Amino acid sequence: DAAKNDDRAAMVMANTWSHSAPGLMGGHKSPGMTLYFGGLRLLQRTPEGVYFADLAACNAFEAGPVRAEAVTCPTLVVLGNEDKMTGPKQSRAVAGSIEGARVIELDCGHAMLSEQSNAVLAALKTIV
């Protein structure tokens, strides 16, 4: 309801759930910077109604398992072990639906590109 009503509390909740414990406590490689407030500011720049539409589309998508089973190319699933938005269990289930998929688990939350950008890059280099 918060996202539907453009209540910024929805963004605060999602941003909190997107970061690992270290990411919530600063976690930025540059002194004086914070991952949490950087992520929140990005969400706050979203035009009215767009954030809710994004969440609603994710929530309504039900073809994931069928689509995953149809994947035939080499696949790498990169997951964050502290991801509260798309939990590790769900990510492993997707990987399990794709024949031959590999999983790399990183020490981060959903915001893996801000928390562990070099580790994400290293993971991607293993498949390209």
Question: What spans do the regions from the language model cover?
Answer:
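Short beta-strand/loop motif that positions the catalytic acidic residue
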Residues: 71, 77-79, 83
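Conserved alpha/beta-hydrolase catalytic His-Asp/Glu region
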Residues: 2-69
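Residue-level signal for the nucleotide or nucleotide-sugar donor/cofactor binding architecture
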Residues: 46, 86-89, 115
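Short alpha-helix in the alpha/beta-hydrolase fold that links the catalytic acid
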Residues: 73, 87-96
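Catalytic active-site module of serine/aspartate enzymes centered on a nucleophile-bearing elbow/loop
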Residues: 99-128
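Hydrophobic alpha-helical packing elements
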Residues: 10, 51-54, 94, 113, ...
